[in-house]
Swiss-Prot record:
Protein name: cAMP-dependent protein kinase catalytic subunit alpha
Binding site for ATP: 50-58, 73, 122-128, 169-172
Post-translational modification: Autophosphorylated. Phosphorylation is enhanced by vitamin K(2). Phosphorylated on threonine and serine residues. Phosphorylation on Thr-198 is required for full activity. Phosphorylated at Tyr-331 by activated receptor tyrosine kinases EGFR and PDGFR; this increases catalytic efficiency.
Gene Ontology CC terms: acrosomal vesicle; cAMP-dependent protein kinase complex; cytoplasm; cytosol; mitochondrion; nucleus; perinuclear region of cytoplasm; plasma membrane
Gene it is expressed from: PRKACA
Regulation: Allosterically activated by various compounds, including ATP. Activated by cAMP; the nucleotide acts as a dynamic and allosteric activator by coupling the two lobes of apo PKA, enhancing the enzyme dynamics synchronously and priming it for catalysis.
BP term (GO), one: cellular response to heat
SUPFAM superfamilies referenced in this protein's UniProt entry, alphabetically: Protein kinase-like (PK-like)
Positions where Phosphothreonine occurs in the chain: 49, 196, 198
GO MF terms, alphabetically ordered: ATP binding; cAMP-dependent protein kinase activity; protein kinase A regulatory subunit binding; protein serine kinase activity; protein serine/threonine kinase activity
Membrane topology: Lipid-anchor
Enzyme class name: transferase
Source species: Ovis aries (Sheep)
Occurrences of domain Protein kinase (ranges): 44-298
Subunit-level organization: A number of inactive tetrameric holoenzymes are produced by the combination of homo- or heterodimers of the different regulatory subunits associated with two catalytic subunits. cAMP causes the dissociation of the inactive holoenzyme into a dimer of regulatory subunits bound to four cAMP and two free monomeric catalytic subunits. The cAMP-dependent protein kinase catalytic subunit binds PJA2. Both isoforms 1 and 2 forms activate cAMP-sensitive PKAI and PKAII holoenzymes by interacting with regulatory subunit (R) of PKA, PRKAR1A/PKR1 and PRKAR2A/PKR2, respectively.
Amino acid sequence: MGNAAAAKKGSEQESVKEFLAKAKEDFLKKWENPAQNTAHLDQFERIKTLGTGSFGRVMLVKHTETGNHYAMKILDKQKVVKLKQIEHTLNEKRILQAVNFPFLVKLEFSFKDNSNLYMVMEYVPGGEMFSHLRRIGRFSEPHARFYAAQIVLTFEYLHSLDLIYRDLKPENLLIDQQGYIQVTDFGFAKRVKGRTWTLCGTPEYLAPEIILSKGYNKAVDWWALGVLIYEMAAGYPPFFADQPIQIYEKIVSGKVRFPSHFSSDLKDLLRNLLQVDLTKRFGNLKNGVNDIKNHKWFATTDWIAIYQRKVEAPFIPKFKGPGDTSNFDDYEEEEIRVSINEKCGKEFSEF
């Protein structure tokens, strides 16, 4: 690198430091003093279910006053308690109301009633990366790199706030109208200084240290980034099998095979992300995220332009206007039932 290029790199890294310091101030204000009860169920018209999960559903809703569409996550308090997800759910809301980044879905309102918790988020009409990836088969390397760059910046932001995301997968990445990513589902996100021990995540994306019940840190997110980049560029994940236990055996073995069409730069980056040895895994070394940002596979990436959303997206989802749900699957609709008695008031008092 010439002197001029090195100086430019240096000043960019300095301004990132300043940006993150300011971002942390903003985050901590909201983290220490979370917004509560900022809307009510009656203010929304429920339109259609966009997705379902073990303790709730996400629905497209329309804010009757403004006419704006949102995605409303509805969680059944009793089911959350039964599935021992109280802490995760409180984390999710507390984190979402405090973060602010171009590639994180925005929490617009949150509230609760006798039966449910509600998180009302920006509606991202392009649907999940998962469905586009399955339809197209695999993404070209430039296409995969465009998305990967956004995740790198997002993790750099989250990790600077001591947040681990822990649930990276194509199902949790929505594509917005400009073709950029919105990361959704902070159900497993956690504020951690040092290490944590919870077993959570999706089998194919789990880092070896989680499987081996070791204490782990934010390096698990960089491992998951390796899995995601591989899956985007190959069309299938690096470790897969019929049973989770077989997947886990492959993950901890430290062996990965690459499709012949992968470029040598891509293979090199993935070997450094899918690195079982934590002392060698990119993102976890003394240069932190810069080992990834300065890697040859990202040589053409203009990180600032990505952050400013100035780079032309490789793919814009088809979109027929506000409230269009054609990029989401259909689900059976169900009434939202609200009890006349309060359920689990104590457990969710801080929500």
